[in-house]
């Protein structure tokens, strides 16, 4: 019941639109159309219906796999991979990820300016 409760609170939360918008911004900032494919295919497999969108988009943008099975103490969490056919991330992917994140934020700022100018007109 807790799983259903947590999932339904994620779906009904105010993060629904921002999560998807963030995924779209990351995909657009990657300048790679296949990132949209990865996001659309893999986001729904994440345990969080909201976190999966930007995470799947970043996995596609970096060309690496993210999430997947992991260990918390003695407990193994069997999470699915996002962009599972790709290789594991390397240290250099942190810098690349930050660059992709910055590009996505520039796109977000441009969108906000356009919206503000339209509302002002």
Functional labels for PLM-detected ranges:
Residues 1-7, 11:
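Single conserved hydrophobic/aromatic residue that forms the stacking wall/gate
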Residues 9-121:
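Catalytic cores of Mg2+-dependent Asp-rich isoprenoid enzymes
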